[in-house]
């Protein structure tokens, strides 16, 4: 990239934080947005949690999504502000380092690391059975584990080759996910309209309690939004690879949450309106695929499942990218074990190869001990909430002392 005024400004801002430019800056607004959008991956989150929502709170449970969107958008606004003030790779680790104490920053960095290492195999475990079904591979524990391990290996390899290739693939995945979600939403709305679907189903509580007793189940359904609308800060983790990062990243963070929230809400409404028989859906092991295939037919259903596979793969790949940058950011501060190895950037690929290999090894180990992982996978919901809480509390306490940069987001 030509080292013009914007590049020079990015370098000067980074040097103000006592870091030198080592990673190649090539990400622009869409690519930065794509990183955050893929990490959120509404396709992955909704497909994983729709069954829980529909069986816990009935069709009316989908409206908790709107509440979760508002809450996460407020968090995103704070993170966007921090990304504009401190445009350095490492997101919450770097922010809290300057808002609180080094110990709190170190703890936050390690919590973030644990979350990312756990969530990669968890995401790919969601891809495996869908891919196996499309390829007519028998769904067994051994086959699923092999698919997950191969997926993790491929995601790591793409990251080692370089951020440019990974970004190209991710940009394409975001495009296909967006087109797929919009297209499927329209098809489901049309199908529901053609069979004169009753809009009152959107307020049905199904087998759940009604009245004041419904408050508990409804609150539980918010877990879908809480599980899904996380990871938007991933674009901040690639700040040092982003052009004009202090303006680009904040816009990407807010846009990713806002558009994910809007697309997700319309998709949930369309899917719920298209329910052919509520009793059958409530008793189904896979309610959403059942609704899609019974409404649109086998061909369109499988076509969308291909898009689902692409979206989930991109989600895991982006998380791998984000994890590598976190390890790199912590290592150059000597806040990670064997920092002298993990802070190195490959001159050929402009990527933290050693850090990515560490992620690969740890994720393969987690996958091999999958029975233990299932007990830990709940942490992938708790850990980001803890990271957000620590960041927001640290920011609220230090906000009056934060120096805002003129011209920032």
Predicted regions, residues:
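Membrane-interface "cap" regions at the ends of multi-pass membrane proteins
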Residues: 1-62, 66, 73-77, 205-206, ...
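Juxtamembrane interface elements at the cytosolic ends of transmembrane helices
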Residues: 4-16, 49-50, 79, 225-245, ...
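Select transmembrane alpha-helical segments in multipass membrane proteins
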Residues: 25-37, 62, 101-114, 147-150, ...
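Hydrophobic transmembrane alpha-helices that form the core helical bundles
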Residues: 48-56, 64, 73-152, 156-160, ...
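Juxtamembrane helix-boundary/capping and inter-helix hinge elements in multi-pass membrane proteins
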Residues: 56-59, 85-89, 98-104, 240-248, ...
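C-terminal membrane-solvent junction of multi-pass transporters and transport-like membrane proteins
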Residues: 169, 340-350, 388-409
């Amino acid at each position: 990239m030509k080292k013009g005024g914007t590049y020079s400004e990015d370098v000067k801002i980074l040097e103000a934080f006592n870091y030198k430019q080592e990673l190649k800056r090539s990400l622009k607004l869409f690519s930065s947005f794509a990183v955050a959008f893929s990490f959120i991956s509404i396709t992955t989150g909704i497909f994983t949690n729709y069954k829980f929502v529909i069986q816990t709170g009935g069709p009316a449970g989908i409206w908790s999504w709107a509440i979760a969107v508002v809450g996460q958008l407020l968090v995103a606004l704070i993170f966007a502000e921090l990304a504009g003030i401190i445009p350095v790779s490492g997101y919450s680790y770097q922010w809290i380092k300057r808002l609180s104490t080094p110990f709190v920053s170190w703890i936050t960095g390690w919590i973030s690391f644990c979350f990312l290492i756990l969530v990669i195999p968890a995401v790919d475990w969601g891809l495996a059975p869908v891919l196996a079904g499309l390829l007519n591979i028998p769904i067994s524990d051994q086959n699923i584990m092999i698919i997950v391990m191969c997926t993790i290996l491929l995601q790591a390899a793409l990251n080692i080759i370089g951020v440019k290739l990974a970004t190209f693939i991710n940009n394409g995945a975001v495009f296909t996910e967006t087109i797929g979600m919009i297209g499927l939403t329209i098809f489901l709305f049309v199908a529901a309209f053609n069979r004169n679907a009753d809009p009152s189903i959107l307020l049905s509580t199904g087998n759940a309690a009604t009245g004041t007793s419904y408050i508990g189940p409804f609150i539980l359904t918010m877990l879908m939004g809480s599980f899904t609308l996380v990871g938007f800060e991933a674009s901040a983790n690639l700040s040092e690879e982003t052009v004009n990062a202090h303006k680009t990243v904040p816009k990407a963070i807010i846009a990713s949450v806002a558009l994910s929230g809007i697309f997700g809400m319309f998709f949930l409404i369309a899917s719920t309106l298209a329910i052919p028989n509520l009793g059958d859906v409530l008793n189904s092991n896979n309610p959403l695929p059942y609704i899609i295939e019974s409404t649109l037919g086998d061909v369109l259903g499988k076509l969308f499942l291909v898009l689902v596979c692409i979206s989930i793969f991109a989600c895991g790949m982006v998380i791998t990218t984000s994890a590598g940058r976190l390890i790199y950011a912590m290592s150059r501060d000597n806040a990670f074990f064997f920092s002298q190895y993990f802070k190195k950037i490959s001159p050929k690929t402009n990527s933290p190869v050693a850090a990515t290999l560490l992620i690969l090894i740890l994720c393969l180990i987690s996958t091999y001990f999958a029975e233990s992982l299932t007990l830990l996978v709940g942490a992938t919901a708790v850990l980001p909430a803890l990271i957000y809480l620590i960041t927001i509390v640290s920011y609220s306490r230090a906000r009056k002392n934060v120096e805002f940069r003129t011209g920032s987001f």
